[in-house]
Design a protein with these regions (language model features):
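Conserved beta-strand/loop positions that form the S-adenosyl-L-methionine
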Residues: 136
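Short, conserved beta-strand element in jelly-roll/cupin
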Residues: 44-54
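Conserved short histidine dyad/triad with adjacent acidic residue
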Residues: 22-40
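Short catalytic micro-motifs in class I SAM-dependent methyltransferases
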Residues: 201-202
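Class I (Rossmann-like) S-adenosyl-L-methionine-dependent methyltransferase catalytic domain
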Residues: 102-128, 139-178, 182-192, 206, ...
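Short acidic-glycine-tyrosine-enriched beta hairpin
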Residues: 61-81
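Ligand-binding loop in jelly-roll beta-barrel domains
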Residues: 80-102
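A conserved beta-strand element that flanks and buttresses the S-adenosyl-L-methionine
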Residues: 198
């Protein structure tokens, strides 16, 4: 089947997160011979090193849809997510490997078990081009690492040394250059200035008396035409949502008011979100 342009573009952006050791006709796990599922969001590449195999696509009842005879010279397309496949050795000297690929968004989840980036964050960075960026309360770095992968110049700050250690570790393994700083956000004294400052799921863990100073500080340290993105918990008790046992929740409209002197690119209050309602803002500094 010919790949559409969209599929070709998608596949050219995939990243390999795992590779099997070399499998042989003798060491081939039983599941491969009986029929195995490829996971959601995971493309599989078959690399035949030596020998021959029969590769079959099956339906959900394990009945044959189509089958190919393959050898090291065969041109094998990527196996799409949620396919049912079966591998049958066709020579005793068969040797092959499988490589597993996913989108950039899912890469650090699949390889390091980090949470995937927040959906609001993914939408926001469609607006923001790679630039000098501050991740305020980076945690283990699910957003910092993703942005660094996309070519952003990232500084990550957090007050949890263990998380920062993990973030540094992954960035070294992936050869990503991230500036990692142990810093207490509540001090509201960020020194450097940035084109993009963002904070997702962080404000709700901070002391409520510090929120105004922190937002004022990050607005000040944002370059002209730069952006701020904040996503944090929202009090939606009047909509029947339970009170959230967190140190701080924005009330309706509050987050938007903090940015009334900026250009608001998008603002929303997601009342039905799980596990808790949240407010999000993406705003641009249009005047000093």
């Amino acid at each position: 089947s010919k790949l559409s342009e969209k599929e070709q573009h998608m596949e050219s952006n995939l990243l390999c997160f795992k590779r099997t050791p070399t499998l042989t006709a003798l060491s081939l796990p039983k599941t491969y011979k009986e029929g195995f599922f490829t996971e959601s969001g995971v493309w599989t590449k078959l690399i035949i090193i030596k020998g021959k195999m029969k590769f079959a696509f099956l339906n959900l009842e394990n009945e044959l849809i189509r089958q190919y005879s393959l050898n090291p010279k065969s041109n094998v397309e990527l196996i799409k997510p949620l396919s049912v496949c079966r591998i049958t050795p066709n020579s005793t000297d068969l040797q092959f490997q499988l490589e597993f690929y996913c989108s950039r968004e899912d890469f650090f989840y699949n390889k390091y078990n980090l949470n995937t980036p927040h959906s609001e964050f993914i939408d926001a960075i469609k607006v923001v081009n790679p630039c000098k960026t501050l991740d305020l309360g980076a945690g283990k770095g699910r957003h910092s690492l993703y942005l660094s992968l996309l070519g952003f110049d990232v500084t990550s700050i957090d007050y949890n040394a263990e998380f920062l250690h993990e973030l540094t570790d992954i960035s070294i393994k992936e050869k990503l250059d991230i500036n990692v700083i142990d810093h207490d956000i509540a001090k509201a004294n960020i020194k450097g200035s940035y084109d993009f400052i963002f904070s997702t799921d962080v404000f709700m863990y901070l002391n409520p008396t510090r929120i105004q100073s922190i937002i004022s500080n990050i607005k000040q340290q944002t370059h002209l035409n730069g952006y701020n993105l904040i996503v944090s918990a929202l009090n939606a008790t009047k909509h029947g949502r339970p009170l959230i046992p967190l140190p701080f929740t924005f009330i309706e409209g509050e987050l938007k008011e903090y940015y009334e002197d900026w250009k608001i690119i998008s603002y929303s209050e997601n009342i039905t979100a799980s596990p808790y309602p949240y407010a999000m803002i993406l705003a641009q500094k249009v005047s000093e």
